[in-house]
């Protein structure tokens, strides 16, 4: 491990970039030297505000050069950086902001007690060496899950783990990442830097000598055309819509060299179709918030493989008793990597369930072939992936059952052209009651957010029973919405 902690590797990349453009934001171009200057001033501002090692800093920021610099500055002072996604439902946002947060940093117009980027930038740079205060075993960042369990879980990653990641170190890149990095001349950035994927591929772009290009409106294919992007992250639903748009009215995507599909599995036939329509540009990444990237399929890999895990990542396929199984046999994936989270912040019960003996239990099912390629076949968890976000069925069922009109509620997922998967609910009415579907949708939205709202709600007399006599919602069939 280097003498200086994270983010030394990132700061070295910015220093090496010098006058090379590293971020384009509208009509503004920011060089490596300028971005490094922003990091230095923001770090000075955070220290002047009394913030340092171990302090939690919530970053409620848009996608700007200052936002990227603020995240790096938070690491420089040794804080626990907590990115807050825009649009997080109120109850979930309040939960995140109660997790030992010492300060909130915003773009402008702060709530009472918050700091703005502009205020922090008023602190002058003293011109001396930038002191890095991160301690190896301190938590460097919390990356929150989607919150579909009712409260988002904060995956806690230490400074030692951040330093162990390959992102900023070209010498450590596995072959698939090396191929991807060679295509990151102009990487499209959008959405939120609270996204683990968005931020880490931004750092990868710096290491590859490329430029991050900020898109205010991530509409595909328009954003690729407008910014002449060579690379972008894309969710499965967006990929499907892009392929359909290109079939109907092809746009000029000659600049595009890499689309990194993430967030949920891609059907093998749809991945082949995407490569047929878009060309050899589609990468398919597999990973989790808890582990980071586990493997990546390049355009030359044959679907449905998700590629080869790199040597620094251990992956075991285990049976229900926890015993490793041979190649070709399906089982649950357990993963161990130097860069993984150490657990969930302030959640010892869930941490004990998922993080045990140095391994992360993914609750995904898959197998290796004889050559070491990884394949995914399903999930052990009762979750539905909507727009690349995981939504647990249990909280949705409990929200529906909270209505006085409902006696029982069951939720299942099904493939959906627009969102990857969709939530479908089946409800048994309470005696003498007639459920109102609109009111039920509002109830779920208010409690859990838009992503958990069922696409369909079907009223049934009872749920089918399995051989054991217990209700078996796997026997419920969502309505066909393709017609």
Name every feature range the model reports, one short phrase each:
Residues 104, 337, 342-343, 365-452, ...:
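AMP-binding/adenylate-forming catalytic core of the ANL superfamily
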Residues 166-186, 192-231, 245:
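Conserved AMP-binding/adenylation subdomain of ANL enzymes
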Residues 308-312, 323-354, 389-391:
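Conserved ATP/PPi-binding loop(s) of AMP-dependent carboxylate-activating enzymes
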Residues 207, 230-233, 245-303, 314:
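Gly/Ser/Thr-rich phosphate-binding loop
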